[in-house]
Amino acid sequence: MAINRGNIAKQLLPGLNAVFGLEYGSIEDEHVPLFEIENSDRAFEEEVLFTGFGEAPTKSEGAAVQYDSASESFTSRYSHETVALAFAVTEEAMEDNLYDTFAKIRARGLARAMATTRQVKAANVFNNGFNANFAGGDGVAFFSNSHPVVGGTQDNLLAASDLSETTLETALIAVQNTQDDRGILTGTRAESLHIPPNLQFTAEKILASTLSTTPVHFGFASNGTGPTNKDGVTNVNDVNAIRSMGMLPRGYFVNHRFTDTNAYFIKTDVPNGAKMFVRAPLATKMEPDFDTGNLRFKARERYSFGFSDWRSYYGASPA
């Protein structure tokens, strides 16, 4: 239904000091640090994992060399979605509106709506990342302790412990122990931490503090002798190893569309991980309807979000 003069009755008369509701800011492009972004020229994109070789065995003198084999494993598919939104305005409403409302709706309202959908879809790759109903190409959730590999399973699911200096150190060790499908260490390093707004102050304290933020227990024995035991922040000269060693060189990023207020994710330097494919970039159109005189405005884009190599991220979802 087109927006008509009945929808904008106050804006047909002079004297309004302001028409508000269209001037709000927006939170956009939070998907950029999460995803590798590529263009696409087809209906869908596929990426296949190719397993390499295992460790080379020792060859005895005079013995035949041992052969190994490599093969394709699972395939990840990115099916592009079309996202579009439109509105129409009657010819009379356009003529009689005194406050240029429709220009603002076209410039800001459509862009805001399209950007919000894009950010929500991007964040949902992680919001659904612990749910087996949203499996990746290998048949399990993005963050799982049972990713199938040659000869067994591997995991990128961190312990369900709240974000702290200690749990982050443990997670960073797990990242460095990442192996390929044949069990060979990949030399993986962490790049950045990704969190909901609820954890931003915790992350800032952990990553920006020069000294350790790990709480310690000090006092006398727990049998009750001596002063009452107390918990406090360490007052010894322990460095913040995460910061001093540069373990997260890109720091942390807040994503306001993460729905789990306790979950956190570590991005690694493994390529071909979380990806966004852009099939058709955002475009807007305006055209009149000859019969009614209504003006119609439309915004449209096509893209897909997903992941290929699960080793690109480690995630935790504390209760």
Predicted segments, located by residue:
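Assembly/oligomerization interface modules of large self-assembling protein complexes
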Residues: 22-83
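Solvent-exposed, flexible loop/coil residues
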Residues: 54, 71, 82, 93, ...
